[in-house]
């Protein structure tokens, strides 16, 4: 008999720590294809941004480094990953049996030694702090390492384990450190690893202490179906929504389609 996913051990770890690392979750071949697609898409996005030409999503350029948002329509591989079968039991098991897509983005980053940390929690309305503590699980984010991040110092995703349960924010002095504050950890894992984390978990990009390498990641976020919290959810072209399969349409609100689709029958 197959063990249901997530396992009881994984659930316990996620509930107590606010994150879960699934090492080598994507195959090496899959990672290679995603990297090839992302490099092509980033080059296209940078050209459009530099020429001031309109395009779907947001493109942020910082020297040789780039971050792009709204990636589902940039390449079929990115759309395919939004409901990747191996991931789906984790999304439905940890968040909601009928999850919605919330947001997607990609990061291609090269050594940035002058940069400090960027600690934050996710969520609109000041990270949902007005709901009181502990902030509930309203968004589940998944980060995929596409480059080897098994060693620290390459901008690795950093987290403060258990901070999703805290009624307090980290001390201001700790948030402004150029390195990790006590208790925070860098997520070190090989390429293809997936990191799932709670919206209220304090997290940040990590410090660069190496001269070589790159931090290349994909991020996908999911939310409850009764939430309307992300502009990306309705920010694609009509053609994009019309091309979605019936299964993928369920990841989006029914009002996006023509005619609108009923969801709760």
Located regions from the model:
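Non-heme Fe(II)-dependent double-stranded beta-helix
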Residues: 1-16, 23-128
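Short, surface-exposed loop/helix-turn segments at secondary-structure junctions
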Residues: 120-125, 172-181, 233-239
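Short, conserved beta-strand element in jelly-roll/cupin
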Residues: 129-151, 188-189, 221-224
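Non-heme Fe(II)/2-oxoglutarate
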Residues: 201-202, 206-265
């Amino acid at each position: 008999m197959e063990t249901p996913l997530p396992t009881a051990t994984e659930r316990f770890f996620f509930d107590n720590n606010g994150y879960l690392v699934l090492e080598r979750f994507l195959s090496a071949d899959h990672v290679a294809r995603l990297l090839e697609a992302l490099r092509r898409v980033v080059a296209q996005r940078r050209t459009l941004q530099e020429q001031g030409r309109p395009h779907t999503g947001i493109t942020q350029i910082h020297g040789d480094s780039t971050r792009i948002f709204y990636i589902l329509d940039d390449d079929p591989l990115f759309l395919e990953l939004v409901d990747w079968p191996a991931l789906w039991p984790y999304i439905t098991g940890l968040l909601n049996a009928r999850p919605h897509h919330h947001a997607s983005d990609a990061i291609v980053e090269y050594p940035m030694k002058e940069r400090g940390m960027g600690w934050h929690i996710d969520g609109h309305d000041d990270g949902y702090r007005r709901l009181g503590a502990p902030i509930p699980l309203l968004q589940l984010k998944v980060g995929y390492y596409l480059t080897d991040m098994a060693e620290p110092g390459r901008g690795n995703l950093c987290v403060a384990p258990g901070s999703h349960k805290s009624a307090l924010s980290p001390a201001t002095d700790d948030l402004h450190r150029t390195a990790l504050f006590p208790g925070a950890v860098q997520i070190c894992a090989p390429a293809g690893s997936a990191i799932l984390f709670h919206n209220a978990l304090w997290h940040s990009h990590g410090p660069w202490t190496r001269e070589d390498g790159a931090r290349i990641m994909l991020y996908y976020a999911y939310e409850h179906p009764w939430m309307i919290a992300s502009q990306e959810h309705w920010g694609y072209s009509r053609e994009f929504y019309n091309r979605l399969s019936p299964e993928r349409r369920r990841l989006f609100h029914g009002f996006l389609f023509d005619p609108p689709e009923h969801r709760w029958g």
